[in-house]
Protein backbone atom coordinates (compact mmCIF):
# COMPACT_ATOMS: atom_id res chain seq x y z
CA UNK A 1 0.00 0.00 0.00
CA UNK A 2 1.16 3.54 -0.75
CA UNK A 3 2.60 5.35 2.22
CA UNK A 4 1.36 8.79 1.19
CA UNK A 5 -2.06 9.53 -0.29
CA UNK A 6 -2.63 12.78 -2.15
CA UNK A 7 -6.26 13.67 -2.71
CA UNK A 8 -7.19 15.62 -5.83
CA UNK A 9 -10.53 17.37 -6.03
CA UNK A 10 -12.21 19.76 -8.39
CA UNK A 11 -15.43 20.32 -10.24
CA UNK A 12 -16.28 19.03 -13.67
CA UNK A 13 -13.97 20.38 -16.36
CA UNK A 14 -11.46 21.95 -13.97
CA UNK A 15 -8.46 19.89 -15.07
CA UNK A 16 -8.31 16.96 -12.63
CA UNK A 17 -7.37 14.57 -15.44
CA UNK A 18 -4.57 16.83 -16.66
CA UNK A 19 -3.14 17.07 -13.14
CA UNK A 20 -3.45 13.33 -12.47
CA UNK A 21 -1.81 12.56 -15.83
CA UNK A 22 1.21 14.62 -14.78
CA UNK A 23 1.48 12.72 -11.51
CA UNK A 24 1.02 9.39 -13.30
CA UNK A 25 3.85 10.28 -15.70
CA UNK A 26 6.05 10.70 -12.61
CA UNK A 27 5.28 7.16 -11.44
CA UNK A 28 2.47 7.93 -9.01
CA UNK A 29 -0.35 5.36 -8.96
CA UNK A 30 -3.80 6.83 -9.60
CA UNK A 31 -7.11 5.81 -8.02
CA UNK A 32 -9.75 7.79 -9.93
CA UNK A 33 -13.39 7.90 -8.83
CA UNK A 34 -14.58 8.52 -12.41
CA UNK A 35 -12.84 5.36 -13.61
CA UNK A 36 -14.16 3.40 -10.62
CA UNK A 37 -17.69 4.63 -11.36
CA UNK A 38 -17.40 3.25 -14.89
CA UNK A 39 -16.07 -0.06 -13.55
CA UNK A 40 -18.93 -0.59 -11.10
CA UNK A 41 -21.50 0.11 -13.84
CA UNK A 42 -20.24 -2.51 -16.29
CA UNK A 43 -22.55 -5.31 -17.43
CA UNK A 44 -22.58 -8.15 -14.92
CA UNK A 45 -21.99 -5.86 -11.95
CA UNK A 46 -24.69 -5.47 -9.31
CA UNK A 47 -25.04 -1.71 -9.90
CA UNK A 48 -25.52 -2.28 -13.64
CA UNK A 49 -28.46 -4.59 -13.04
CA UNK A 50 -30.08 -2.21 -10.55
CA UNK A 51 -29.64 0.79 -12.86
CA UNK A 52 -31.27 -1.10 -15.74
CA UNK A 53 -34.10 -2.27 -13.45
CA UNK A 54 -34.69 1.28 -12.24
CA UNK A 55 -34.28 3.27 -15.48
CA UNK A 56 -35.36 0.60 -17.96
CA UNK A 57 -33.62 -0.92 -20.97
CA UNK A 58 -33.76 2.43 -22.78
CA UNK A 59 -30.76 3.42 -20.65
CA UNK A 60 -28.60 0.93 -22.61
CA UNK A 61 -26.66 1.68 -25.77
CA UNK A 62 -26.47 -0.59 -28.82
CA UNK A 63 -23.65 -2.60 -27.18
CA UNK A 64 -25.79 -3.33 -24.12
CA UNK A 65 -23.82 -1.00 -21.84
CA UNK A 66 -25.06 1.97 -19.84
CA UNK A 67 -25.49 4.97 -22.13
CA UNK A 68 -23.69 7.43 -19.87
CA UNK A 69 -24.79 10.61 -21.69
CA UNK A 70 -28.43 9.48 -21.50
CA UNK A 71 -28.08 8.59 -17.81
CA UNK A 72 -26.32 11.90 -17.11
CA UNK A 73 -29.16 13.83 -18.75
CA UNK A 74 -31.69 12.10 -16.48
CA UNK A 75 -29.81 12.39 -13.20
CA UNK A 76 -28.86 16.03 -13.65
CA UNK A 77 -32.42 17.03 -14.52
CA UNK A 78 -34.11 15.06 -11.71
CA UNK A 79 -32.45 15.44 -8.29
CA UNK A 80 -34.17 12.35 -6.88
CA UNK A 81 -32.64 10.21 -9.64
CA UNK A 82 -29.19 11.59 -8.83
CA UNK A 83 -29.70 10.64 -5.18
CA UNK A 84 -30.82 7.15 -6.22
CA UNK A 85 -27.76 6.67 -8.43
CA UNK A 86 -25.33 7.97 -5.79
CA UNK A 87 -26.84 5.80 -3.06
CA UNK A 88 -26.54 2.80 -5.36
CA UNK A 89 -23.02 3.34 -6.66
CA UNK A 90 -20.98 5.28 -4.09
CA UNK A 91 -20.35 2.32 -1.73
CA UNK A 92 -19.02 0.22 -4.63
CA UNK A 93 -16.95 3.13 -5.94
CA UNK A 94 -15.35 3.62 -2.51
CA UNK A 95 -14.62 -0.11 -2.28
CA UNK A 96 -12.99 -0.06 -5.73
CA UNK A 97 -10.87 2.99 -4.83
CA UNK A 98 -9.72 1.41 -1.57
CA UNK A 99 -8.67 -1.75 -3.43
CA UNK A 100 -6.59 0.36 -5.83
CA UNK A 101 -4.96 2.20 -2.94
CA UNK A 102 -4.13 -1.04 -1.13
CA UNK A 103 -2.71 -2.62 -4.30
CA UNK A 104 -0.57 0.42 -5.04
CA UNK A 105 3.13 -0.28 -5.32
CA UNK A 106 4.28 3.32 -5.60
CA UNK A 107 5.31 5.36 -2.60
CA UNK A 108 2.51 7.81 -3.40
CA UNK A 109 -1.00 7.35 -4.71
CA UNK A 110 -3.28 10.06 -6.00
CA UNK A 111 -6.94 9.69 -5.07
CA UNK A 112 -8.94 11.62 -7.68
CA UNK A 113 -12.39 12.61 -6.48
CA UNK A 114 -15.00 15.04 -7.70
CA UNK A 115 -15.86 18.04 -5.56
CA UNK A 116 -16.10 17.82 -1.79
CA UNK A 117 -17.43 14.30 -1.30
CA UNK A 118 -15.51 11.33 -0.02
CA UNK A 119 -13.26 10.45 2.85
CA UNK A 120 -10.55 13.01 3.49
CA UNK A 121 -9.22 11.09 6.49
CA UNK A 122 -7.43 8.75 4.05
CA UNK A 123 -5.46 11.63 2.57
CA UNK A 124 -2.14 12.98 3.74
CA UNK A 125 -2.57 16.05 1.51
CA UNK A 126 -5.39 17.50 -0.55
CA UNK A 127 -4.89 19.36 -3.83
CA UNK A 128 -7.79 21.32 -5.25
CA UNK A 129 -7.88 22.21 -8.93
CA UNK A 130 -10.23 24.93 -10.10
CA UNK A 131 -11.09 26.83 -13.26
CA UNK A 132 -13.27 29.76 -14.20
CA UNK A 133 -16.85 28.70 -14.80
CA UNK A 134 -16.80 29.75 -18.46
CA UNK A 135 -13.67 27.60 -18.98
CA UNK A 136 -15.38 24.64 -17.31
CA UNK A 137 -18.41 25.02 -19.54
CA UNK A 138 -16.33 25.26 -22.72
CA UNK A 139 -14.15 22.26 -21.81
CA UNK A 140 -17.06 19.99 -20.92
CA UNK A 141 -19.09 21.02 -23.98
CA UNK A 142 -16.15 20.11 -26.23
CA UNK A 143 -15.25 16.92 -24.37
CA UNK A 144 -18.73 15.49 -23.85
CA UNK A 145 -20.53 17.08 -26.81
CA UNK A 146 -23.29 18.49 -24.62
CA UNK A 147 -24.96 21.89 -24.39
CA UNK A 148 -23.95 24.71 -22.08
CA UNK A 149 -27.31 24.29 -20.36
CA UNK A 150 -26.46 20.65 -19.54
CA UNK A 151 -23.01 21.60 -18.24
CA UNK A 152 -24.48 24.35 -16.08
CA UNK A 153 -27.00 21.86 -14.65
CA UNK A 154 -24.12 19.58 -13.63
CA UNK A 155 -22.11 22.46 -12.13
CA UNK A 156 -25.21 23.55 -10.18
CA UNK A 157 -25.28 20.18 -8.38
CA UNK A 158 -21.67 20.48 -7.25
CA UNK A 159 -20.66 22.22 -4.02
CA UNK A 160 -19.83 25.92 -4.27
CA UNK A 161 -16.22 26.92 -4.48
Residue ranges and their predicted role:
Residues 1-35:
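Walker A (P-loop) phosphate-binding motif
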Residues 5, 20, 48, 52, ...:
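A general structural signal for well-ordered alpha-helical segments in protein cores
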Residues 18-21, 29-42, 57, 142, ...:
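N-terminal polybasic phosphate/anion-binding patch
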Residues 26, 55, 121-122:
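Short, structured coil segments at secondary-structure junctions
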Residues 35-105:
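ATP-dependent small-molecule kinase phosphotransfer cores
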Residues 84, 125-161:
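A glycine- and Lys/Arg-enriched "phosphate-lid" helix/loop adjacent to the NTP-binding pocket
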Residues 91-95, 107-114, 149-157:
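Short gly/ser/thr-rich secondary-structure transition/capping motifs
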Residues 96-102, 108-142:
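ATP-dependent NMP and nucleoside kinases share a basic, alpha-helical "lid"
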Amino acid sequence: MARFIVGLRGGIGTGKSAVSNIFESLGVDIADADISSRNVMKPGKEAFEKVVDHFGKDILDSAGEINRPRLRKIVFSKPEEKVFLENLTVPSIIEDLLKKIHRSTSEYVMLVLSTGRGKTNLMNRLLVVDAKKNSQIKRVMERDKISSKEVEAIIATQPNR
